[in-house]
Amino acid sequence: MEAEESEKAATEQEPLKGTEQTLDAEEEQEESEDAACGSKKRVVPGIVYLGHIPPRFRPLHVRNLLSAYGEVGRVFFQAEDRFVRRKKKAAAAAGGKKRSYSKDYTEGWVEFRDKRIAKRVAASLHNTPMGARRRSPFRYDLWNLKYLHRFTWSHLSEHLAFERQVRRQRLRAEVAQAKRETDFYLQSVERGQRFLAADGDPARPDGSWTFAQRPTEQELRAQKAARPGGRERARLVTAQDKARSNKGLLARIFGAPPPSESMEGPSLVRDS
């Protein structure tokens, strides 16, 4: 009896062991398939936007700082305008500084090989100091990072090409406007020269314009002196003025009251 019961138990345990082995094999197969799928899955890169770039901060600096958190791909920094750089140089020259200013940047984009790392870096480093060391020149500058969702490097290239095209069109429009103004000025000058040549005034051989103005006091006196008898009247008037000044001077010296006009002879009235 005991032998029969042991045989039955052995026969019952054999199918159980077989089912366990099949389950283990299926699990191993699923794990291997998952691993194969994971190896075939393409890693999607992610781009982080830098809104603030301190002076003298270069792409090599950002690559060295962010490579500690993940693999960094392409890096692009937008340079400042030439007008701003020219103003900085002029200010430095006016202040007596002979130091040459290098080109600074206004914004930048950093590409990470894995977008999950890019999200993690943007979320953890935002508003934190750039330099960890005490002597770092960027210690008091903060990271201004933002992860750009569904943004690829091709979008950035298209955006930069569009801005470059807009800048060229604006420059062409400004050049055309300046050319139109210059042509209008030259046409006006030529029209004025033709008008002067057609006028034929011998008093203006060089084409200069004359304007009628009111005569000055000196011109009026010269005209009166040029009249017949005008020189004698002018001589008498100057002599009378000199006599008045002499009498006033003597009166101030000796303390006598100055002679009144009634005590003097009748004054000559100038002819108008």
Curated annotation (Swiss-Prot):
GO-annotated biological processes: endonucleolytic cleavage in 5'-ETS of tricistronic rRNA transcript (SSU-rRNA, 5.8S rRNA, LSU-rRNA); endonucleolytic cleavage in ITS1 to separate SSU-rRNA from 5.8S rRNA and LSU-rRNA from tricistronic rRNA transcript (SSU-rRNA, 5.8S rRNA, LSU-rRNA); endonucleolytic cleavage to generate mature 5'-end of SSU-rRNA from (SSU-rRNA, 5.8S rRNA, LSU-rRNA); small-subunit processome assembly
The protein's role, per its UniProt record: Could be a novel TATA-binding protein (TBP) which can function as a basal transcription activator. Can act as a regulator of basal transcription for class II genes.
Main location per the UniProt record: nucleus
Residues with the N-acetylmethionine modification: M1
GO molecular function: DNA binding; RNA binding
Cell location: Nucleus; Nucleus, Nucleolus
Entry keyword Transcription: yes
Identification of the protein by name: Activator of basal transcription 1
Disulfide bonds, paired cysteine numbers: none
Self-association and partners: Interacts with ESF1/ABTAP. Interacts with IGHMBP2.
Gene: ABT1
Ranges annotated as biased composition (Basic and acidic residues): 1-17
Highest taxon of the lineage: Eukaryota
